Amino acid sequence: MKIAVLPGDGIGPEIVNEAVKVLNALDEKFELEQAPVGGAGYEASGHPLPDATLALAKEADAILFGAVGDWKYDSLERALRPEQAILGLRKHLELFANFRPAICYPQLVDASPLKPELVAGLDILIVRELNGDIYFGQPRGVRAAPDGPFAGAREGFDTMRYSEPEVRRIAHVAFQAARKRAKKLLSVDKSNVLETSQFWRDVMIDVSKEYADVELSHMYVDNAAMQLAKAPKQFDVIVTGNMFGDILSDEASMLTGSIGMLPSASLDQRNKGLYEPSHGSAPDIAGKGIANPLATILSAAMLLRYSLNRAEQADRIERAVKAVLEQGYRTGDIATPGCKQVGTAAMGDAVVAAL
């Protein structure tokens, strides 16, 4: 099994190194091949997604990704910025389903900004459609307004759109995920205002006829954002579009106490996927050895579970992470009084020891 390792920028190389350390500690061997991406890709080839990196990603069985982005690239034209690498990988690999778990570990309940009784036992899975919606809809751009009260003035415009096949395939992924959990699926939209959202809801209802054992409900996105802060444990699996999912998954991540704990998976139709921590490249702490590697280590566990069909090995890593937290090890972002505060490498070593 071949894994493409794309560390990226900022803290990416540090945290990916710890995930690789954990993979190498398992009792089976994987072929790991590394390549530059993001700002590192731009420095190496003049493009954030070099041709050789894309070829490796296509050839591999799965991709372990760190993070991309750095302030020093903000002046580049949009097509050359590091963040375009992840968008390019999603497009070229046809990764359309993003899984973002939001789990509050018992040992970290006090780190959440919400009261312990609201988040104790929290375990949400957000399934976000990645390839459509207003992020990719055409036409888009800046022009002279052709009509309206400010006709002739400069305006920016984007297009929100979804095709039926796009909605159906993410619906099936979400229903199947819900079927493996509590058999409850919440679809989030804005169908009281947006035609695209009403269409989304209609297709979700139609697909639900194939999953009689799963309870489908609906919620407007503004209410969902409020309910995530008010009573988050009411949710189990949430499915939504690209933009709403982008926002809600970041909100849900902070319920857990630290975005440094949260993995994610982006999958294609055949469960080949790209696995990355939910956080960014954090250039302000890069090279200091203090970044939390647990989200990346847990992303490696998701990689084993979904793309390589190694559920037992994934379980081992997840149990090791829980054991390390139980032993009191903490990086700075999740530190509590009386804990054993450690750096990036020491946390990775602790997980390996727990294995």
From Swiss-Prot:
The record marks 135, 190 as: Important for catalysis. Its cofactor is Mg(2+); Mn(2+). GO terms for cellular component: cytosol. Mg(2+) binds at residues 222, 246, 250. Pathway: Amino-acid biosynthesis; L-leucine biosynthesis; L-leucine from 3-methyl-2-oxobutanoate: step 3/4. InterPro entries: IsoCit/isopropylmalate_DH_CS, IsoPropMal-DH-like_dom, Isopropylmalate_DH. NAD(+) binds at residues 280-292. It is found in: Cytoplasm. Its EC number is 1.1.1.85. NCBIfam families: leuB (TIGR00169). It comes from Burkholderia mallei (strain ATCC 23344). This is 3-isopropylmalate dehydrogenase.
